[in-house]
Regions:
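Extracytoplasmic gate region of multi-pass secondary transporters
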Residues: 23-24, 206-249, 253-256
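Helix-breaking motifs and short loop linkers at transmembrane-helix boundaries and internal kinks
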Residues: 35, 67, 88-93, 238, ...
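Conserved MFS/SLC helix-loop-helix module at the cytosolic interface between two early adjacent transmembrane helices
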Residues: 54-93
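Helix-to-loop junctions at the C-terminal end of transmembrane segments
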Residues: 55-68, 148, 258-271, 349-350
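Helix-loop-helix hairpin linking two adjacent transmembrane segments in secondary transporters
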Residues: 94, 128-179
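Cytoplasmic helix-loop-helix junction between adjacent transmembrane helices
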Residues: 98-132
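C-terminal transmembrane helical hairpin of 12-TM major facilitator-type secondary transporters
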Residues: 269-313
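A late C-terminal transmembrane helix in Major Facilitator Superfamily
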Residues: 318-354
């Protein structure tokens, strides 16, 4: 029963990844058709991320009231309908409106499933969970590259909708499975009463403030690559839109591979050591990226494992009773990075040119690395650092 539920959760995380990489791959074809500036993509990503932040911040209340299973089904269905709307939109304002349900659905899925896995499964399962997210975001630009080869980005969104609606159906039919697994868990383990923390209470915890910055930075790296990588390759490196979309597929494939390898190593190498390996991987990637597009694959490979490993440490670092509140806040700040990085680079590229994209990633990498060091020191001082976790 536990294994079947785990498979369902993995499938749900494919659904979480499906919408995230589409806009970046499709944008080189969308903005000329709509006759809008290239940096208008930031409006869409800003709305998606902002709604994801709101959804994540209130996720503990929603999940405690309706349960992880029902929230996940409803949220996945909502994102599927939004993707269908994208495929038929003929004005930019409609893309912006449809970004709202896309973001609201993503935040609830992300917060609920991450905390569920962190509490009930091992670190390897957490990495494999995010590996399946990587499968979702890898499949989407591949589908989009096929659509762009036929000169129609709309078909890419329609294909993504079909994938998402099938995942919704699987989740809907799995609802009885969640109930059985929940009852079994209550019989076999002593449940820790969840404690809801306010934003003010979390802000007063120095370790929480630090991990917020880390989450912001690592996700800013991830989504800056996903949103602007294709445009950088087209306008800065002379790639065709379909070849650029394929390279973004490789970027997300690298992210999935990094998480898969981290999951394989989970039983042999501690979580903190795997985070260190990821940091080293990103260091190599940002050194290569100014000279070769293969650096995008390496960024995904290294950065991909940092986020899920930090997420899995949430109950260890802060305690199981408050993990859902802090999990939601971490994911909210992660999406602040998603929300801020694309429009920020849009401004930077307008001022300095698209060619500075690799250097933008280097700055984000330095911020992330410095604050991970601060976080480890804070945990050691408070006695919460577990190097064997």
């Amino acid at each position: 029963m536990t294994i079947l539920l785990l498979i369902v959760i993995y499938i749900a995380f494919i659904g979480l990844g499906v919408p995230d990489s589409l806009i970046g791959s499709a944008w080189p074809a969308i903005y000329p058709e709509f006759g809008i500036p290239v940096d208008s993509v930031s409006c869409v990503t800003l709305l998606v991320s902002g709604c994801t932040v709101l959804s994540s911040m209130f996720s503990d209340r929603l999940l405690n009231r309706f349960g992880t299973a029902k929230v996940t089904v409803f949220s996945t269905a909502m994102t599927a309908l939004a993707l269908l709307g994208f495929s038929v939109s003929n004005r930019f304002v409609f893309l912006c409106l449809l970004a709202i349900p896309l973001g609201l659905g993503a935040g609830a899925i992300d917060s609920g499933l991450n905390n569920y896995i962190a509490l009930h499964y091992s670190a390897s399962h957490m990495n494999f969970l995010h590996c399946f997210y990587g499968i979702g975001v890898s499949a989407s630009p591949y589908l989009m590259s096929l659509a762009l080869a036929e000169n129609t980005w709309r078909e890419g969104y329609r294909s993504a909708f079909l994938v998402q609606i099938c995942i919704t159906a699987i989740l809907l039919f799995s609802l009885p499975l969640w109930k059985k697994s929940s009852a079994k868990a209550q019989e076999s383990t002593e449940e820790v009463a969840p404690q809801t923390l306010s934003l003010k209470q979390m802000w007063q915890m120095p370790e929480v403030r630090t991990v917020w910055v880390i989450m912001l930075a690592t996700n800013a790296i991830e989504y800056a690559c996903g949103t602007w990588g294709s445009t950088w390759l087209v306008e800065g490196r002379g790639f065709t839109p379909e070849n650029a979309a394929f390279m973004i597929t490789l970027y997300y494939a690298g992210m999935a591979l990094g998480r898969f390898l981290s999951g394989i190593l989970a039983n042999r190498v501690s979580t903190w050591k795997r985070i260190g390996i990821g940091i080293l991987g990103v260091l190599i990637a940002v050194a290569v990226l100014p000279f070769s597009a293969i650096g995008l694959f390496l960024v995904g490979l290294g950065n991909g494992s940092i986020y899920p490993n930090l997420i899995h440490l949430t109950p260890v670092n802060f305690g199981e009773s408050v993990s859902q509140s802090i999990m939601g806040s971490q994911i909210a700040t992660a999406y602040l990075g998603v929300m801020v990085a694309p429009p920020l680079f849009g401004l930077v590229s307008n001022l300095l040119g698209i060619q500075v994209f690799p250097w933008f990633l280097i700055v984000l990498f330095v911020i992330m690395t410095v604050f991970i060091g601060i976080f480890v020191r804070q945990l050691k001082v408070s006695g919460r650092y577990d190097k064997t976790a």
